[in-house]
């Protein structure tokens, strides 16, 4: 599947805020956004008046970059969200949150969604006892995600177990036990991404 392969730190600078795409590095002085908190390029420090379309576009780009998704797949998520009952913008964020790579990240495996995606691709996880190596796989309520037995003994997963994260309300389990469960679909208040999904819906609705 296609993915962005350029300079990650430029994405945060372009959006004007930290997207925490590099995990722990984003909390250190090495963070490029902390050192140069303006847009990249020759005219990055100049201030421009942003149109309504520009604001909508920036929100879409921000969401794509947070979840590591390119345009074609992102539009597919929007179209699916629009077909579902309920609020389209919230449906969109819920679909993104229920991706396996994001759930793995939320459970504490990986310092970033990029690392979590790599772990999924390399076949480290089981969903309901079956190996799944597709990052975009949509998990469902009551699904159980476990680490493969062979992977539990690796230094990487031992490190994750020693540094557990606080889980969101819609997930349960513990990283030390190498298991997590999707208790329910996330509500909007459970999704802590700095995105105004209404602007994204307005953009695609034109």
Swiss-Prot record:
Q: Which CDD domains does the entry mention?
A: S4 (cd00165)
* Keyword tags: Ribonucleoprotein, Ribosomal protein, RNA-binding, rRNA-binding
- Give the S4 RNA-binding domain ranges: 98-164
SMART domains documented for this protein = Ribosomal_S4, S4
Keyword rRNA-binding in the entry? The reply is: yes
One GO MF term on file is: rRNA binding
One of the Pfam families matching this protein, by short name: S4
Keyword Ribonucleoprotein belongs to the record? yes
PROSITE patterns on file: RIBOSOMAL_S4, S4
Give the UniProt entry's GO cellular component terms: small ribosomal subunit
Q: Which residues form the signal peptide?
A: none
Q: Provide one Gene Ontology biological process annotation.
A: ribosomal small subunit biogenesis
Looking at the record's lineage, which domain of life comes first? Bacteria
HAMAP family named in the record: Ribosomal_uS4_B
Family according to the record: Belongs to the universal ribosomal protein uS4 family.
Subunit architecture? Part of the 30S ribosomal subunit. Contacts protein S5. The interaction surface between S4 and S5 is involved in control of translational fidelity.
Summarizing the function annotation, the protein's role is: One of the primary rRNA binding proteins, it binds directly to 16S rRNA where it nucleates assembly of the body of the 30S subunit. With S5 and S12 plays an important role in translational accuracy.
Q: This chain belongs to which protein, by name?
A: Small ribosomal subunit protein uS4A
According to its UniProt entry, this protein's organism is Clostridium botulinum (strain Hall / ATCC 3502 / NCTC 13319 / Type A)
Q: Which gene encodes it?
A: rpsD1
């Amino acid at each position: 599947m296609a993915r962005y392969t350029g300079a990650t730190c430029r994405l945060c600078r372009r959006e004007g805020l930290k997207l925490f795409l590099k995990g722990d590095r984003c909390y250190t002085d090495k963070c490029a956004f902390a050192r140069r908190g303006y847009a990249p390029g020759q005219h990055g420090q100049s201030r421009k008046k942003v149109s309504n379309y520009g604001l909508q576009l920036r929100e879409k780009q921000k969401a794509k970059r947070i979840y590591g998704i390119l345009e074609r797949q992102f539009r597919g998520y929007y179209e699916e969200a629009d077909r579902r009952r309920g609020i389209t913008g919230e449906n969109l964020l819920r679909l993104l949150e229920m991706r396996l790579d994001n759930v793995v990240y939320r459970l504490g495996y990986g310092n970033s969604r990029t690392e979590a995606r790599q772990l999924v691709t390399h076949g480290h996880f089981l969903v309901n006892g079956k190996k799944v190596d597709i990052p975009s796989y949509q998990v469902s309520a009551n699904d159980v995600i476990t680490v493969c037995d062979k992977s539990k003994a690796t230094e990487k997963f031992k490190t994750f177990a020693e540094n557990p994260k606080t889980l969101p309300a819609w997930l349960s389990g513990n990283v030390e036990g190498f298991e997590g469960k999707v208790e329910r679909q996330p509500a909007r208040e459970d999704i802590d991404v700095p995105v105004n999904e209404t602007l994204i819906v307005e953009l695609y609705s034109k």
